[in-house]
Swiss-Prot record:
According to the redox status, the Cys-103-Cys-142 disulfide bridge may have a role in regulating protein function by affecting its ability to bind capped mRNA. This is Eukaryotic translation initiation factor isoform 4E-2. GO terms for cellular component: eukaryotic translation initiation factor 4F complex. Recognizes and binds the 7-methylguanosine-containing mRNA cap during an early step in the initiation of protein synthesis and facilitates ribosome binding by inducing the unwinding of the mRNAs secondary structures. It comes from the Eukaryota. InterPro entries: TIF_eIF4e-like, TIF_eIF_4E, TIF_eIF_4E_CS. It comes from Oryza sativa subsp. japonica (Rice). The lineage of its organism: Eukaryota, Viridiplantae, Streptophyta, Embryophyta, Tracheophyta. SUPFAM superfamilies: eIF4e-like. EIF4F is a multi-subunit complex, the composition of which varies with external and internal environmental conditions. It is composed of at least EIF4A, EIF4E and EIF4G. EIF4E is also known to interact with other partners. In higher plants two isoforms of EIF4F have been identified, named isoform EIF4F and isoform EIF(iso)4F. Isoform EIF4F has subunits p220 and p26, whereas isoform EIF(iso)4F has subunits p82 and p28.
Length: 206
């Protein structure tokens, strides 16, 4: 049987070229699965007749890991926020308003945070879980809101389909693990919150 000569190593397979390609890849932006947008709402005393959300502003839309860390480190930490302010991270194209089509039939899981360090840690863990697509029901999630208030801070995870109890409970359980929260977490419908006397007990809990 005739011997078959081994094919010469292609230039692209040499250690030098592979190392150069690896170094270039390490410097390249790390793309996320989808685009996200940071929003903020610095609330002053509203003018008579002003509609809710008039102070809400979109700050930046991003789709790389590097952009996320730059925005978070420089701006979007709760410790950098004054009282009566909100930070939002929502999927690009979704506004953090009840009226948005993606949010209109949804609701939110809410977690109270008694200390700034707790809020900051929970906020960061939630942000990383969202942009890292750690939720099995990630298509159901709209975004998250960090609210800094004198009477107590809180986080709220907004979802799309409030009536789907099984999906919302799964999301709530996963979020509870992510933020390492041990007390009861409640879910409320946006429709309930629009009423003059919304239910304080929530629709679901985990």
């Amino acid at each position: 049987m005739a011997e078959v000569e081994a094919a010469p190593i292609a230039a692209a397979e040499t250690p030098e070229v592979a190392a150069a390609e690896g170094a270039a890849a390490a410097k390249a932006p790390h793309k996320l699965h989808r685009q996200w947008a940071f929003w903020y709402d610095i609330q002053s005393k509203p003018k008579p007749g002003a509609a809710w959300g008039t102070s809400l502003r979109k700050a930046y839309t991003f789709d790389t890991v590097e952009e996320f860390w730059g925005l978070y480190d420089q701006i979007f930490r709760p410790s950098k926020v004054t009282v009566n302010a909100d930070f939002h991270l929502f999927k690009a194209g979704v506004e953090p308003k009840w009226e948005d089509p993606e949010c209109a039939n949804g609701g939110k899981w809410t977690v109270p945070c008694s200390r700034k360090t707790t809020l900051e840690n929970m906020w960061l863990e939630t942000l990383m879980a969202l942009i890292g697509e750690q939720f099995d029901e990630s298509e159901e999630i709209c975004g998250v809101v960090a609210s800094v208030r004198q009477r107590g801070d809180k986080l709220a995870l907004w979802t799309r389909t409030a009536s789907n109890e099984a999906v919302q409970v799964n999301i709530g359980k996963k979020w509870k693990e992510i933020v390492d929260y041990n007390d009861k977490m409640v879910y409320s419908f946006h429709d309930d919150a629009k009423r003059e006397k919304p239910s304080r007990g929530g629709r679901y809990n985990v």
